[in-house]
Amino acid sequence: MDYVEKLEDLLSQKYTYHEIAENLYLNYSSLIDTDEVYRIRKRLSEIFGCNMNDVRLIGSAHTGYTFKNDKLEIRKNPKDYDFAIISPNVFAAYFHKINVNKIETRNRGNYTKYILEGKIHPLYADPKFLKEMQTLYTMIANELDIKRHITVCFYLSEKAFIEGLVNYNHKLYSMVLKRIRDSAIRDLPEMVVKDIPKMEG
């Protein structure tokens, strides 16, 4: 499945941004090596003590595209596996492992913003927590012989996960929707003129 085409199709059918995020990230499987993704998801679920369905692949490894600097880029061979763990229990456990007083000043704003949205992004946690997570990523990659870099974020709930994706992808969805609408408007005059009956002189 082409995720860009699917995104355009869902927007054309007037799905809401939330429904699009649910479809693309909860309903459809990832584009790349699903056996490898399965092995990583299974291992992450064992390590974090959650269901395998609580572990979701996101990012360009899932959709085959990334959106940077207002440009949609196709990624046929992504460098990373970005995972989301959607579990209130795991979220609470890892929330309490973070030493808020040790978070670097430059990261505090992002850490607080994400926590209020029901997300833990290890990149903005304290250095010790981040290092432990990076060690874990390396261990999993070595254990399963994975060449791509692995990262994990934690979400309090499925609602927080979808809201986060909508916020992250809002600009992309709006850009694609505008392109669809502009295309429809460009086609409109030709159709209207064609459908007007000729006047007999």
Question: Where are the regions a protein language model picked out?
Answer:
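Catalytic core of pol beta-like nucleotidyltransferases
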Residues: 1-79, 86-201
